[in-house]
Amino acid sequence: MLLSELSHPNQLHGLTVSQLEEIACQIRERHLQVVSTSGGHLGPGLGVVELTLALYQTLDLDFDKVVWDVGHQGYPHKLITGRFSQFDSLRQQNGVAGYLKRSESKFDHFGAGHASTSISAALGMAIARDRKGDNYKCVAVIGDGALTGGMALEAINHAGHLPNTPLVVVLNDNDMSISPPVGALSSYLNKVRVSPPLQFLSDSVQESVKNIPLIGKDIPEELKNIKGSVRRLSVPKVGAVFEELGFTYMGPIDGHDIGNLVKTFNAAHKLKRPVLVHVVTTKGKGYPYAEADQVGYHAQSAFDLTTGKSIPSKKPKPVSYSKIFGQTLLKICEQDSKVVGITAAMATGTGLDILQKNIPDQYIDVGIAEQHAVTLAAGMSCDGLKPVVAIYSTFLQRAFDQLIHDVGIQNLPVSFVLDRAGIVGADGPTHQGQYDISYMRSIPNFVLMAPKDESELQRMLITSINHNGPTALRIPRGSGLGVAIMDEGWEPLNIGEAEIIEGGEDILIIAYGSMVASAIETAKILKNMNINACIVNARFVKPLDKNLIMPLASRIQKVVTMEEGTLIGGFGSAIVELFNDNEINIPVYRIGIPDVLVDHASPDQSKEKLGLMPDQMADNIVKKFKLVN
């Protein structure tokens, strides 16, 4: 059978191992062809091809439920669930999403873009199944990196106390999340992974299997058939941690051996209780460059399949904000040993990899554990260190309570750098950094800022570190504007001080962060209509520079705010509140992201759809204030 002929995963039923292996080759070929052309997540999907095929041969996907953690691993799933012909549109506007999405396919049982959610969701489905009296299977597939997340461990703790609730958790152990995994759990899994087999399953498990009505007597023989691949240690006991938590542990087994995977999954389903199947895979399997550099090929822009090298853009791009942040923080750390960079499994993405390589003693990776990262930083600041926590805007949402309870209330000097703030593009609604202005603005004691360019980023970083209280600095995804930066001697900003970029008396545009550049372009278009705009770079959303903004607004009487974030509770709302609190009755036109989810597309396509391109904003400003007769 050809992969292109698969329209339903149940068509895998009855296929031989050799037929499944042929489909596996076709999946990798299609996966590589599409990602090399348009970009996307490469290594994770290549590593779970055999796992996916084997698992789906043991399930009826019209009834059974599978929850894939994060969705990085979901490309093979998409290719065998009716999206082969549309796969060229991966991560493109109106195309196939890069993550699982319930609205896209009935086989996407649960959507996810953030890690560590799968076991909770699958357990919830299992509990609902049992209460309804149904009998479908529920499976969670989670990577070893995601298993470091507290939510996953909370779910394991809960599921283990439900011994009569059938649930299969497949641990896809490739010893790699996005960055190399960290922590004691990772070290434990590594010991399990390399340990020799001493005993196959415990006598108690075999005995419990025998006691299953009708089918119990047949299972031990089936289990014996997979003795070579499903292993369990006696001393030290492999899987002891999971078994103490109430799971039956099976593994570790070869995640690329389809025959043994099928037998193992069938055995796991028959146990009718919480089972953890430990599958060892190779991230990037089948593509030598991805196997050799599992971090670099986790996700890729378009690249040459033959050489494995990225296809350079036609025009050289300025250095990214993330890299400039990392380079600047490294310089600061070299001058001050009390400054420590903290990341949650995103060293490369946040630019902290340069700190990790050069001054590892001033670098901490906590794994996929944002809540822990925030409170860890709070504790460090209590005893004189100066923590700088670099986390994507979308992931910091996961630690909102810690931001309030552990940092804000205690007014601790922790610096947060929110990477990927604003519209991020192809990763879609789970990754858009559109909420941080709103959720951070409500926390007392925090100072919030966003730079207009790379140089201002450097000044804001030193301002944050020097400030005796909590700060949050948001930076956008992608390249900077190409302005000159300094290697040292950055001048701190005065907290809450804005600047006038351009004078004008017809309209006042107050822009925040990345939207300052767009405001300048918008003003140029307005100028061609003989409309002169005054442009203010707010720099800070909290505190606002009321001494600058209110007199300008009172004089010009027409105000526009621009932000790359949700309008609800955002920067524009802060301006409206400022005017209202000071009894200034001035019309304000807020431009930003309305109350919608921003789907996957290129950043410019998303901005155009939202009306955030300069020509659109200029046109809407003119219409709003009737500036042209």
Curated annotation (Swiss-Prot):
Which HAMAP family does this one have? Answer: DXP_synth (MF_00315)
- EC number(s): the record gives 2.2.1.7
Q: Which reaction does it catalyse?
A: D-glyceraldehyde 3-phosphate + pyruvate + H(+) = 1-deoxy-D-xylulose 5-phosphate + CO2
What cofactor does this protein call for? Answer: Mg(2+); thiamine diphosphate
Q: Say what the protein does.
A: Catalyzes the acyloin condensation reaction between C atoms 2 and 3 of pyruvate and glyceraldehyde 3-phosphate to yield 1-deoxy-D-xylulose-5-phosphate (DXP).
Q: Which residues bind thiamine diphosphate?
A: 72, 113-115, 145-146, 174, 287, 370
According to UniProt, the name of this protein is 1-deoxy-D-xylulose-5-phosphate synthase
Kindly report, in one word, the top-level EC class recorded for this enzyme: transferase
**GO MF annotation, one:** 1-deoxy-D-xylulose-5-phosphate synthase activity
The record's GO CC annotations read: cytosol
Upper lineage is:
Bacteria, Bacillati, Cyanobacteriota, Cyanophyceae, Synechococcales
Q: Which organism is it from?
A: Prochlorococcus marinus (strain MIT 9301)
How many cofactors are bound and how?
Answer: Binds 1 Mg(2+) ion per subunit. Binds 1 thiamine pyrophosphate per subunit.
Member of which family?
A: Belongs to the transketolase family. DXPS subfamily.
- Could you provide one GO biological process annotation from this protein's UniProt record? thiamine biosynthetic process
Q: Which CDD domains match?
A: TPP_DXS, TPP_PYR_DXS_TK_like
| Keywords per UniProt | Isoprene biosynthesis, Magnesium, Metal-binding, Thiamine biosynthesis, Thiamine pyrophosphate, Transferase
InterPro entries assigned? Dxylulose-5-P_synthase, THDP-binding, Transketo_C/PFOR_II, Transketolase-like_Pyr-bd, Transketolase_BS, Transketolase_C, Transketolase_CS
